[in-house]
Amino acid sequence: MGFRINTNVAALNAKANSDLNAKSLDASLSRLSSGLRINSAADDASGMAIADSLRSQANTLGQAISNGNDALGILQTADKAMDEQLKILDTIKTKATQAAQDGQSLKTRTMLQADINKLMEELDNIANTTSFNGKQLLSGNFTNQEFQIGASSNQTVKATIGATQSSKIGVTRFETGAQSFTSGVVGLTIKNYNGIEDFKFDNVVISTSVGTGLGALAEEINKSADKTGVRATYDVKTTGVYAIKEGTTSQDFAINGVTIGKIEYKDGDGNGSLISAINAVKDTTGVQASKDENGKLVLTSADGRGIKITGDIGVGSGILANQKENYGRLSLVKNDGRDINISGTNLSAIGMGTTDMISQSSVSLRESKGQISATNADAMGFNSYKGGGKFVFTQNVSSISAFMSAQGSGFSRGSGFSVGSGKNLSVGLSQGIQIISSAASMSNTYVVSAGSGFSSGSGNSQFAALKTTAANTTDETAGVTTLKGAMAVMDIAETAITNLDQIRADIGSIQNQVTSTINNITVTQVNVKAAESQIRDVDFASESANYSKANILAQSGSYAMAQANSSQQNVLRLLQ
């Protein structure tokens, strides 16, 4: 190796190595002081990109968890409010059940209805005031609300909370057939009871025998109510057109084949002979007699079999010739508010044939609060004739007098009850029946309007497949103020409870979904943060070793550089 003065190669090498080591020492000190392995893109370009992506994902997941907790807060608020509404509905149903017995007077039923009205007001108040951050929850406007619960857009959970006002819940379907006057074997099928399948019931005989009639059919329907969702009730009742007048039955007078014989009775059945004679055989006939508040004879089938009068019960009874065979009205109830679609054979025997007038209506909880309209009342199975209503007869006569004079009416000359007999039966008849003798009176009686498809000249004079309100039915008083109304309110309240339970079940399902999602993304967030830490954070043990190495090299480099510089002094010895 030659001796040179101008260029100290050894010193230059020592400096270069010291510079490199200084950079390593600076990087090591930076990592140890920041705790990060990557402090700039130069440290690890690809690693920094990955770490930044993971950090963004973790932060977004953190906000998604917060969003999910907000969703849970909303759902829990709605759930607790609906829990209180369910308690209110339970109370309403209990009060309706309390009213559904004839031990209650109109006064006490009215008091119960007042309680129910207040409860409904509070139910609606809860529905209209329950909110979260200014958003109404139970008014029906909280539909398809989305909550972002993922790191990427459109990773959402949707929530819908149904309306819980009294006008929106409890919608119950009521359908009641026309009065049946024919017997026979009935085959009944409920179409699409579950949206897909049909349900066929066993055939039932409609007659006056024990174990037959609408009572037997209702029992058959109710056996499968849990499956079909359809329940049935019946009303087999024959009511006189006017108050009982003095009269006599014939020797062969019989009800449901059981001979009762000749009976003389007074006005209003003052001596009780007619009613007591009928009731003496009620265990055999299944028919019980009574008087209503207007003094009219009422024959009621206890078990739903038909009521058939043979012989002559007497015109004074108020029972007209075409009332002597009666198989009643069948009422069907469905708790989901949808149409009850039926088919079958001989449906006219239950008042639901193709030419029968079937009353139908869907009634909400709120509608049971006030006066029940005639449409709803008839669909619920209230008696079509009650006090101020009228029986409707189609006759080829134009007046009550002509009806009384017609052969077979029981009011013809010589009967003792004819026009001008002094018994004023024409007045009672005019109050109790309406004669339909022309298209005009048909339209007036049934309130058939133009455009309805049933106006004069439409060709639908037989009212084929007509479903509407029975003629001349009357409005009924509110809710539980009548026995029948109390029964209907029980059905409606039960439907309302089912509706709320379904809404709460949906809320519960969404709560479980959100909770599971929060649990999942919480674990994901932890794992993502761990992955980011592996890339971005410094390993202090490893970096401390690197620092020690660089520090020692820095010291040794300084020594080496000093030695390299001092080696040039050796050249001076050559010049001595």
From Swiss-Prot:
Q: What does this protein do?
A: Flagellin is the subunit protein which polymerizes to form the filaments of bacterial flagella.
- Binding partners and assembly: Heteromer of FlaA and FlaB. Interacts with FliW. Interacts with FliS.
The record's listing under InterPro entries reads:
Flagellin, Flagellin_C, Flagellin_C_sub2, Flagellin_hook_IN_motif, Flagellin_N
Q: Name one Pfam family in it.
A: Flagellin_C
**Disrupted-gene phenotype:** In a double flaA-flaB deletion, cells grow faster and are non-motile, flagellar filaments are non-existent.
Region of interest (Required for interaction with FliW), ranges: 1-44
UniProt entry keywords in alphabetical sequence: Bacterial flagellum, Secreted
The organism of origin for this protein: Campylobacter jejuni subsp. jejuni serotype O:6 (strain 81116 / NCTC 11828)
- SUPFAM superfamilies with a match to the protein in the record: Phase 1 flagellin (SSF64518)
Naming one, the record's GO cellular component terms include: bacterial-type flagellum
Q: What is its main location?
A: secreted
Gene (UniProt): flaA
Induction context? Translation is inhibited by translational regulator CsrA (at protein level).
**Protein name as it appears in the record:** Flagellin A
Highest taxon listed in the record's lineage: Bacteria
Give any GO molecular function from the UniProt entry. Answer: structural molecule activity
Subcellular localization(s) per the UniProt record: Secreted; Bacterial flagellum
Entry's free-text remark on domains:
Interacts with FliS via its C-terminal domain (residues 537-576), interacts with FliW via its N-terminal domain (residues 1-44). May form a 3-way complex of flagellin, FliS and FliW simultaneously, in which FliS and FliW do not directly interact.
